[in-house]
Amino acid sequence: MAVKFHLCLLLIILVGMGAHVAFADQQFCDHPYGTCYYVEDECPEDMPVDCSENFYCTEPTNKCCCYE
């Protein structure tokens, strides 16, 4: 029973570390760079650039819209 618990705990830690490493090369999409919007919506006129390649949002259904 203890072995299963330790394996489960190890799996949770490894998945968490993998999620962190996935965004290590990107900055969080936030002020002053941009704002996160739903992927199906267009970026607003004052933030027309879709900069999801450089910035990430916490929700996978969002994209980052940045200023020019």
Curated annotation (Swiss-Prot):
It comes from the Eukaryota. Residues 1-24 form the signal peptide. It is found in: Secreted; Nematocyst. GO terms for cellular component: extracellular region; nematocyst. Its main location: secreted. Keywords: Disulfide bond, Nematocyst, Neurotoxin, Secreted, Signal, Toxin. Transmembrane segments: none annotated. Induces neurotoxic symptoms on zebrafish. Has also been claimed to be implied in calcification, but tests on homolog proteins suggest that proteins of this family have a neurotoxic function and not a calcification function. This is Small cysteine-rich protein 2. It comes from Orbicella faveolata.
